[in-house]
Amino acid sequence: MTLELSAAGPRTPRITTRGETVPTVPPASTAADAVDVTALLERGRTLATPVLRAAINRLAPPMDTVAAYHFGWIDAEGNPAEGDGGKAVRPALAVMSAEAAGAAPEVGVPGAVAVELVHNFSLLHDDLMDGDEQRRHRDTVWKVHGPAQAILVGDALFALANELLLELGTVEAGRATRRLTTATRALIDGQAQDISYEHRDRVSVEECLEMEGNKTGALLACACSIGAVLGGADDVTADTLEKYGYHLGLAFQAVDDLLGIWGDPVATGKQTWSDLRQRKKSLPVVAALAAGGPASDRLGELLAEDAKSSDFENFSEEEFAVRAALIEEAGGREWTAQEARRQHTIAIEALDTILMPDHVRAQFVELADFVVVRKR
């Protein structure tokens, strides 16, 4: 049986268990070889961090300390630390989008910080709902400070995000806030879908893509437009940048799904087979179940048996490895990798429909390339 996505044209990725040829996807663009993606990410982090720290300092104790721990600025005892603050993809995109509108990168900083606050609000709640005990190579907030603090600090970060934008007091800030709140609502919808899918035997590829578009694509789309909106861009430009960001988000999540099963824990900061431990209906799993064939059928049987178990505490590493191997044998790993490349291509093509400085376009291309080859 072959799994296909509709309306994707000649680049449609396929998986098969019957010996058919899997079409290749063009490699990630090399048009921006001169762009240093590490420098792009660091610029976004450098511009956003002072404003982010000042925002966190507004929080009442102990929420300020708990948030500082989450961002890696202090350790569990309150001592200064140099923790891993994440990849900083969203801040980088926000300041780049300001440049796309012809504004200085600094114009996008309030948007960069607002998006980063919403992103981390979602991580705090997500870790608690999923029972994740590790993030960025350290214990999660709920594990150290308790579930109540994780919930409260997450709520506070969401409030701060809107506060920072509205304090600008401009028409552009109002437009930016509307886009951010719309993206946040979509993110919450996606999280609700994700949780509900954990308790279903079957989820379609289309449902999975919709969920991941909401959960990851919406906020990345906002990051790609919010700086441009603050810089005075019209809705056509902002909407096009959002399209780039939405499909970049789907590519990003597809890679995350691969790392959630086959990623190196040293690089990801999470347990081996982390998504399998949480019964996630991620793209590799959904695609493998939809593929048909012996490996797909056996995987379905095992996952149905797993659903009857209250937890996976007694599962051996070998049992998780068996499930991962069946997903790969059924074609779920290969299909998801190709889907990441397909979404990457759609994102890049969106950039061709609007005007922006050539060096900024090259930055967007390079960052998209980074997303599909990253290891964490």
Q: Could you describe each region identified by the protein language model?
A:
Residues V66-H70, A114, G131, R179-A183, ...:
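Short acidic/histidine-centered micro-motifs embedded in hydrophobic/aromatic stretches
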Residues D33, V37, L41, L59, ...:
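Residue-level recognition of alpha-helical structural elements
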Residues E99-G102, G227-V236, L259-V266, G300-K308, ...:
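C-terminal helix-coil-helix/basic helical segment that borders enzyme active sites and/or dimer interfaces
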Residues D127, E163-L164:
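Glycine-rich phosphate-binding loops that contact phosphosugars or nucleotide phosphates
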Residues R53, L59, A81-K87, I151-L152, ...:
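All-alpha helical catalytic cores of prenyl diphosphate-utilizing isoprenoid enzymes
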